[in-house]
């Protein structure tokens, strides 16, 4: 049916699916039952657990659906990714939250999430993951967001590059002064 096809196409922004996640991101109800039905009907939806709570699309099917969504409803795709980012952030899954924020172009949100997650990434030796995200966002985005600049500074500290760390701290300080946010959470960190 058309409503199932729309559900599949819009759900394709997510690499893992659950009823709660789909209900939140797609602003609907009854997703858990629909996911179970689609999985049983062999709609290229693969269960990830014995309780049929989590699913994933076959990768090629997901790529096709996501490509279709991007062509037909680019604004909706961005909004779905924004909501998915919010859902995952609310559950402390920084990787998925950050990936969705980057995908929808929410630079400020990505910076906020990266900054919140940086202690965990640094202490677990996941500096390269953070660097990859900063590279995906690009130099211009990092240079225009205080949280991203501070995240770049932290990654440079862990790599032992004090010169670049100081550069990014200076960029963040300038941005916060321009915004008049020197007394906020990030500003307190710099003082």
Predicted regions and their residues:
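Short intrinsically disordered, low-complexity coil segments enriched in acidic
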Residues: 1-6, 185-186, 191
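Acidic catalytic motifs of isoprenoid enzymes
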Residues: 166, 170, 174-177
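Extended alpha-helical scaffolding segments used for macromolecular assembly and cargo binding
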Residues: 74-159, 164-168
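Flexible helix-coil transition and linker loops at the boundaries of alpha-helical arrays
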Residues: 135-144, 175-189
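Structural signature of alpha-solenoid helical repeat scaffolds
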Residues: 49, 72-73, 105, 140, ...
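Short alpha-helical scaffolding segments that buttress acidic/His motifs in well-ordered protein cores
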Residues: 8-12, 152, 190
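C-terminal boundary/linker of central alpha/beta nucleotide-binding cores
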Residues: 1-70, 79-82
């Amino acid at each position: 049916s058309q409503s199932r096809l729309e559900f599949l196409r819009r759900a394709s922004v997510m690499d893992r699916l659950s009823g709660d996640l789909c209900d939140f991101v797609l602003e609907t109800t009854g997703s858990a039952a629909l996911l179970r039905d689609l999985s049983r009907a062999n709609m290229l939806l693969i269960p990830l657990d014995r309780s049929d709570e989590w699913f994933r699309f076959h990768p090629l099917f997901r790529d096709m659906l996501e490509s279709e969504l991007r062509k037909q409803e680019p604004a909706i795709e961005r909004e779905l990714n924004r909501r998915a980012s919010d859902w995952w952030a609310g559950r402390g899954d920084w990787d998925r939250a950050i990936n969705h924020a980057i995908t929808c172009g929410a630079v400020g949100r990505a910076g906020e999430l990266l900054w919140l997650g940086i202690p965990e990434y640094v202490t677990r030796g996941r500096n390269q993951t953070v660097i990859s995200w900063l590279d995906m966002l690009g130099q211009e985005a990092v240079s225009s967001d205080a949280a991203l600049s501070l995240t770049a500074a932290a990654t440079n500290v862990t790599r032992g590059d004090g010169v670049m760390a100081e550069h990014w701290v200076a960029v963040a300080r300038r941005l916060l002064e321009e915004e008049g946010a020197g007394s906020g959470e990030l500003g307190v960190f710099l003082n």
